[in-house]
A protein has these predicted regions:
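Short, Φ-rich (hydrophobic/aromatic) sequence segments
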Residues: 32, 36-38, 104-115, 162-164
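Charge-patterned, long linear interaction tracts outside catalytic cores
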Residues: 138-183
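Mg2+-dependent endonuclease catalytic cores in nucleic-acid-processing enzymes, primarily RNase H-like
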Residues: 46-143
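ATPase catalytic-site recognition across NTP-hydrolyzing enzymes
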Residues: 1-28
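Long hydrophobic segments that form regular secondary structure
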Residues: 18-36, 41-45
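Acidic active-site catalytic centers that drive phospho-/nucleotidyl reactions
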Residues: 29, 81, 156
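Short hydrophobic beta-strand segments
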Residues: 25-29, 78, 122, 147
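Short, glycine-/Ser/Thr-/acidic-enriched flexible segments
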Residues: 31-33, 44-47, 84-86, 151-153, ...
């Protein structure tokens, strides 16, 4: 069935600006037909994730240009699918992780619960809303997962939002670890 209803998604719109200079996740994916590359950016403010569409472009080159621009902020971490990972620039090698079906399986119900509990905010972008509200969740032997096959249209922005929200909401160490040198 439907993952999130339009009324539910719309009830979490915020006018708050997306924060800068805070730890954040940029999740990137390509559409099923590789005709489109998308990125969703997520950060946490006051214990709530805030998400926005970072880009929707037609070529891989444009995608990398957007990724480089956004990741000029050293606090941004990249979550990218294995298909695109092979072309990851050397300067970003230390700030990324791969995400795919396994992570969707782990995070789909978690992020749905976060949305229903009001822990995910967005600024009402139409395309993101369309992808989120058309996404269909299916039951598998391993759990529930967002299904591109069962959804009546593209959901890559929803997939990226799911990865970004789950990863950015993971508790972080507030202070830098101390370097201890012993005798």
């Amino acid at each position: 069935g439907a993952w999130i209803t339009p009324a539910e998604w719309d009830s979490h719109i915020t006018t708050e600006d997306f924060p800068t200079g805070v730890p954040s996740i940029l999740a990137v994916d390509s559409s099923v037909d590789d005709a489109r590359y998308v990125g969703v950016h997520a950060a946490v403010i006051d214990n709530q994730a805030i998400v926005k569409v970072a880009f929707v472009v037609q070529t891989e080159n444009e995608m990398w240009e957007h990724i480089e621009r956004i990741m000029a902020d050293q606090k941004v971490q990249l979550a990218i699918t294995p298909t695109l990972e092979i072309h990851l620039p050397m300067n970003l090698q230390r700030r990324y992780q791969t995400v795919g079906y396994g992570e969707l399986l782990r995070f789909s119900s978690l992020v749905r619960s976060m949305i229903l509990e009001g822990k995910v905010r967005h600024n009402g972008e139409k395309m993101l809303a369309e992808h989120v509200c058309r996404a269909v969740i299916t039951k598998t032997a391993q759990g529930v997962v967002l299904s591109s096959q069962k959804s009546p249209g593209p959901i890559e922005l929803c997939r990226c939002m799911t990865w970004a929200v789950a990863l950015v909401s993971k508790p972080k160490q507030a202070t830098k670890p101390m370097l201890v040198i012993t005798g």
